């Protein structure tokens, strides 16, 4: 917003970082806007009548050329020139966020521009009507049912040299701008349902950049699994992002296919996604942590609202990262848990989740009102603490327990955290 700063206007970067720290927000998930300014909010698909733009603005990654007229009646974009204001703002955010250990999850693409609602393609810089670079997308755009757009097949077609060239330029710009930062995780995009060959191309382009920080694999399950089974490309992945698929509560798998030119919402109209449970989310995270122990796993898929923050604790207890669990200031729970591993033989996904390490300690989420622990191989004596899973506060100090046998500990309330500390 020109001349105005604040929430919903032009964000002050230092204020944004301070807000994140104050509210224990670790990650900022960012992608570029669906259009430059607000006139397109009506979702009409016609060229605007004039250039009387409506603020606030969503700056695009590309600069204007000063030539011709795009669909918003401003000059067309030049995809060879990157918008310095846009990239400097992102770079500045990461510079400041790095000081507090925060993370930018950098989505390179916003697939909503090319699939589903046609209005988002109207002003998109890659549309032939909006740039001077001759990418070869047909004009006029044909909207299905006078509304929908299906440009994914053409957009992801890297067999065309011009498309491959401009994707390569954009991907490398998206990575290289952060070459001296730490707190960046690169993702192809939170809604990506595209094909395997484009995902592999994206990974190769990111990997070709020096100091490219961490790389998240965000895709449909078939594409994820193909990448992870491929020795060449799995080595380019640091984080597995479970987002486009899930296990249903009944144990069946919901897995839309990649590369069929459908958005997630469109898949969900063809196949019933069903509902998840804490146990099914735990299962998904644990499965991929076991298969790929050298990679972090984050879960951003379907969830349900459950009491006592159980869904996020399921993610954490299964070994997942970036779970939305509270700080625990009174005890070194997370410091100790960094050396723990989930203990499958002590975990019943419907009643309790347990992690720990012999001689170091244990952490358990007790779904009901007790937790069963097998300490047969552990001779240490541990102090017992019960913790509120919503607030992170200690609700009870419960004496001590000695290893060497099996113990049953009664929780002060259902769905409590049990921490055994040396």
Annotate each language-model stretch with its function:
Residues 265-399, 406-422:
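Aromatic- and carboxylate-lined catalytic core of secreted/periplasmic carbohydrate-active enzymes
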Residues 180, 242, 340-343:
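A structural signal for alpha-helix termini and helix-coil/disorder junctions
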Residues 1-239, 248:
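Active-site mouth of glycoside hydrolases
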Residues 33, 403-404:
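Short, glycine- and charge-enriched coil/turn segments that flank and shape catalytic ligand pockets
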Residues 68-71, 149-154, 179-181, 203, ...:
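Generic detector of short, locally flexible boundary/turn motifs and exposed helical patches
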Residues 30, 188, 217, 242, ...:
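Hydrophobic side chains in beta-strands
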Residues 179, 191, 245, 320, ...:
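Residue-level marker of positions within ordered structural domains that often coincide
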């Amino acid at each position: 917003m020109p001349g105005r700063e604040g929430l919903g206007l032009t964000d002050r970067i230092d204020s944004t970082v301070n807000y994140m720290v104050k509210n224990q927000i670790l990650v900022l998930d960012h992608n570029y806007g669906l259009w430059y300014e607000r006139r397109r909010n009506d979702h009409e698909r016609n060229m605007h009548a004039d250039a009387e733009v409506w603020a606030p603005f969503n700056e695009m990654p590309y600069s204007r050329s000063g030539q011709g007229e795009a669909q918003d009646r401003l000059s067309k974009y030049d995809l060879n020139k990157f918008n310095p204001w846009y990239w400097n703002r992102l770079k500045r955010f990461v510079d400041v966020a790095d000081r507090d250990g925060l993370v930018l999850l950098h989505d390179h693409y916003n697939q909503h521009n090319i699939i589903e609602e046609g209005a988002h393609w109207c002003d998109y810089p890659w549309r032939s009507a909006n740039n001077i670079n001759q990418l070869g997308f047909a004009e006029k755009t044909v909207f299905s049912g006078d509304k929908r757009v299906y440009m994914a097949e053409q957009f992801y077609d890297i067999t065309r040299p011009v498309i491959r060239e401009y994707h390569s330029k954009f991907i490398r710009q998206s990575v290289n701008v952060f070459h001296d930062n730490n707190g960046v995780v690169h993702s192809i995009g939170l809604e990506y349902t595209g094909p395997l060959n484009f995902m592999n191309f994206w990974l190769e382009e990111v990997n070709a950049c020096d100091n490219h920080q961490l790389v998240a694999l965000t895709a449909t399950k078939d594409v994820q699994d193909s990448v992870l089974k491929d020795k060449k490309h799995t080595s380019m992945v640091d984080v597995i992002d479970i987002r486009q698929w899930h296990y249903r509560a009944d144990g069946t798998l919901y897995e839309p296919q990649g590369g069929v030119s459908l958005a997630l919402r469109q898949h969900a109209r063809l196949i019933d996604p069903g509902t998840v449970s804490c146990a099914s989310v735990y299962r998904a995270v644990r499965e991929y942590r076991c298969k790929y122990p050298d990679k972090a796993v984050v879960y951003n898929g379907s969830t349900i609202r459950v009491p006592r923050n159980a869904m996020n604790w399921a993610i954490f207890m299964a070994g997942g990262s970036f779970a939305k669990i509270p700080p625990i200031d009174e005890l070194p729970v997370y410091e100790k848990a960094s050396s723990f591993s989930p203990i499958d033989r002590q975990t019943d996904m419907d009643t309790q989740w347990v992690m720990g390490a012999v001689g170091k300690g244990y952490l358990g989420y007790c779904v009901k009102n007790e937790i069963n622990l097998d300490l047969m191989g552990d001779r240490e004596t541990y102090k017992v603490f019960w913790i509120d899973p919503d607030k992170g506060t200690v609700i009870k100090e419960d004496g001590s327990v000695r290893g060497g046998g099996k113990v049953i500990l009664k929780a002060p309330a259902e769905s409590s955290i049990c921490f055994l500390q040396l």
